[in-house]
Curated annotation (Swiss-Prot):
Name of this protein: Albumin
Tissue distribution of the protein: Plasma.
GO CC, one annotated term: cytoplasm
Subcellular location(s) of the protein: Secreted
Chain ranges of the Albumin domain: 1-178, 179-377
């Protein structure tokens, strides 16, 4: 939260909080949700300044105010509000979302003849109402996805309300809303399907390759860590009920990518990564997903000494061994970025066979020394 407050305009965190509160209290009216949102935004801004005592006091005040308004917000609040002051906050955070009985179509936002009049009167307020209604009627969508839809709808309103026939133009709205849902559903199926088909190890390698080509300048350990954490996110989230998978994945990837962007912000590895990190919070995950191969990468001169085929690959925990082996693959790709998928597959399989053989051998190092020439022959045949 503090990273979002620091790195993006105020309206981003306000919008994110509005979505989260709207989804939590799905039956609550806009004005009540707005009050809670404003208080949560204010307390987080203060908490991020580092005053722990003031932060705790404001958090307790906020929970008091939520409990005072419990009848307006949610029927599920009674149990949490009956707890002690210290127990209330964790209880509220763990509270399941209140389902809304609102239609997902939200036709009043694009079929009403006064849409453009109302939008022009107060654009921010109109969009806040839309965001509130969209979020509470789409509980299966992540907060980031809801913000993307809201941003897309804003763009449509700007275009249509400036046109001569705005009613005709606004007929694109349901197409836009449906496309957003279709995209995230396809992404969910694609990733969970690939994980199920490939298994942890090969899905991890696939992600490693995919992100290497997006950001080939990143160091091997950083790339291996990123792909590994993404794979663990997929394993956890794809194990949940289908309607929870997308929200789970996007929220966890949002934290992961935020951490990476924080580390990279002083010297971004390339312009594409910089663009994804700083241009739009709502579109950050989508931006990284959509990134294509970085076109301006210049590979270093071939140097086989960077490929550490030795007994170290068999030492340490299983996780440590996997990381070291994947780092060798990244170093290979850095020097041979133009190898195609078939060549990559051939190299991975050859490396895997030698690794299994040598780590099972009595003398690991002698085995690697004996096998290295044959592996390098496969690697360099490009």
């Amino acid at each position: 939260k503090c990273r979002i407050i620091r790195e993006f305009p105020d309206i981003v965190f306000k919008g994110l909080t509005l979505v989260q509160v709207s989804q939590k209290f799905g039956k609550a009216g806009f004005e009540d949700v707005k009050k809670v949102t404003e208080e949560i935004v204010h307390l987080n801004e203060d908490c991020c300044k580092g005053d722990a005592v003031e932060c705790m006091m404001e958090r307790m005040e906020a929970t008091d105010h939520i409990c005072e308004a419990k009848d307006k917000l949610s029927s599920k609040l009674a149990d949490c509000c009956a707890k002690s002051i210290l127990e209330r906050t964790p209880c509220l955070l763990a509270l399941p979302n209140d389902e809304s009985d609102l239609s997902k179509e939200l036709k009043n936002y694009y079929e009403d003849e006064r849409v453009c009049e109302n939008y022009k009167k107060d654009k921010l307020l109109f969009l806040a109402h839309f965001t509130h209604d969209y979020a509470r009627s789409h509980q299966e969508s992540s907060p980031q996805s809801c913000l993307r839809v809201s941003k897309g709808f804003e763009g449509l309103l700007e275009k249509c309300c400036a046109s001569e026939n705005h009613a005709e133009c606004l007929k694109q709205a349901p197409i836009l809303l449906e496309a957003a849902l279709k995209e995230i559903e396809e992404l969910r199926k694609q990733n969970c399907g690939a994980l199920q088909l490939l298994g942890f190890r090969d899905y991890n390698i696939q992600l490693l390759f995919r992100y290497f080509f997006k950001m080939p300048q990143v160091t091997a350990p950083t790339l291996v860590e990123l792909a590994g954490r993404m794979t663990k996110v997929a394993v956890y989230c794809c194990g949940l009920a289908e309607n929870k998978q997308q929200t789970c994945a996007e929220e966890k990837l949002d934290i992961l990518l935020g951490e990476m962007c924080e580390k990279e912000k002083h010297t971004f590895v390339n312009d594409n990564v910089r663009h994804c990190c700083v241009d739009s919070y709502a579109n950050r995950r989508k931006c990284f997903t959509d990134l294509q191969r970085y076109p301006n990468y210049v590979a270093p001169k071939w140097d086989e000494s960077k490929l550490h085929f030795n007994e170290d690959l068999c030492k340490g925990s299983e996780d440590d061994q996997i990381k070291k082996k994947l780092e060798v693959l990244v170093e290979y790709m850095k020097m041979k970025p133009d190898c195609g998928p078939e060549k990559l597959k051939e190299v991975v399989e050859a490396f895997r066979k030698i690794d299994i053989k040598c780590c099972a051998a009595e003398d690991h190092q002698k085995c690697f020394d004996d096998e290295k020439a044959g592996l390098l022959q496969i690697i360099e045949a490009h």
